[in-house]
Design a protein with these regions (language model features):
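N-terminal amphipathic/basic-hydrophobic helices that include classical n-h-c signal peptides
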Residues: 1-15
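RNase H-like nuclease fold core
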Residues: 11, 15-64, 70-78, 150, ...
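RNase H catalytic domain
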Residues: 20-33, 67-143, 147, 152
């Protein structure tokens, strides 16, 4: 039985190599229709992921891009470098805010449903975050933006059930 391209991609990953995850989120209005785009890269292998919701925010889509990218990894304990143009996401991790928010039960914080999902994934892998300036000719960031914007324009998008929590 032939392996799907996605399975071939993930079976080739091992804990000794670094998986690169590029992400971006977009929304038309805040809230409004939004989308996320992610690119997983390992050696010569590359996989694009995208999706959207009809009523969401740009920050939720930035988070969703990272979450969907990490959820796509079928092995645990991988070294992953996430490259994002979202200060919201990168600073929450790199400055340790997320772990403080968790200790306080995410009291008065937006998007607790997504932050909780991200925490589970951060504990499953060895993840480092890298910030890049958005819309600054970074090819992978630009491609993720294209994926996110296209996903936000799909007809009959599903509801973002966590929005508004």
């Amino acid at each position: 039985m032939a392996l799907s391209i996605l399975n071939q991609f993930y079976l080739s990953c091992n804990a000794m190599a670094v998986v690169e995850l590029y992400t971006d989120g977009a929304s038309s209005g805040n809230p409004g229709p939004g989308g996320y785009g992610a690119i997983l890269k390992f050696g010569q292998h590359e996989k694009e992921l995208s999706g959207g919701y009809r009523r969401t925010t740009n920050n939720r889509m930035e988070l969703m891009a990272v979450i969907k990218g990490l959820e796509a990894l079928t092995k645990s304990g991988l070294d992953v470098v996430v490259t994002s143009d979202s200060k919201y996401v990168v600073d929450a991790i790199d400055k340790g805010w997320l772990f403080g928010w968790e200790k306080k039960g995410f009291k008065d914080k937006k998007n607790p449903d997504l932050w909780r999902r991200l925490l589970v994934l951060l504990r499953k892998h060895h993840v480092k975050f890298k910030w890049v300036r958005g819309h600054n000719e970074h090819p992978m960031n630009e491609r993720c933006d294209e994926l996110a914007v296209a996903a936000s324009k799909v007809y009959n998008l599903p509801e973002d059930t966590g929005y508004g929590e």
